[in-house]
A protein has these predicted regions:
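Type III/flagellar secretion export determinants
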Residues: 1-177
Length: 177
């Protein structure tokens, strides 16, 4: 393995993953966004785990999966906080059902979820849904009555997953030679 640092960019070039996962009203400025990178020390840890797993005939064991989950969480929006805000509003009597959400304007929904998130109600077709978007315009959550919440992975999360799995695969493959 070389000692280069691998970074990913959510705008299709492989250079930098930058996202802000703030769900509070004090959003970070674009220049202050969190940046994730596959550092040398992280890559060394992945190589160590891949070698250990290869020795035990396990592919992507629990330690690697936990590491991957922790790294992805660094770029993921705080979905639990967003869901909590919605649930709190629903149970407080402010909004009782999807009909009341439909009547709420987009501005109210955006105030509920906080900057930098935006929300949109869709009430046509076979059912109604509430869609929540991050500052990049990516849908991160959808709520439908009767089904509940559905998480959608962001490009940044996908980039981190891909970088970690690639580093692991290469190390595992080398260890099996």
């Amino acid at each position: 393995f070389s000692s280069e640092v691998i970074e990913m960019n959510i705008s299709n070039a492989i250079n930098t993953v930058s996202v802000s996962g703030s769900s509070s009203s004090s959003a970070k400025k674009t220049s202050e966004k969190n940046k994730w990178q596959l550092t040398d020390s992280l890559k060394e840890k992945i190589v160590e785990l891949a070698k250990k797993d290869a020795k035990n005939n396990i592919y992507m064991g629990n330690e690697f999966m936990n590491l991957r989950k922790a790294e992805v969480a660094k770029v993921a929006p705080n979905r639990a906080a967003l869901i909590g805000k919605f649930n709190q509003s629903m149970s407080s009597g402010n909004m009782g059902d999807m009909k009341e959400i439909q009547e709420a304007d987009k501005r109210w929904l955006c105030i509920l979820f906080g900057i930098p998130y935006e929300a949109e109600y869709q009430g046509e077709g076979t059912g109604s849904a509430l869609h929540i978007y991050n500052e990049e315009g990516e849908e991160v959550l959808t709520y439908t009555q009767g089904v509940g919440w559905h998480e959608k992975e962001t490009k940044a999360e996908t980039g981190v997953h891909s970088a970690l799995k690639l580093a692991y695969y290469e190390a595992y493959h080398d260890a099996r030679k």
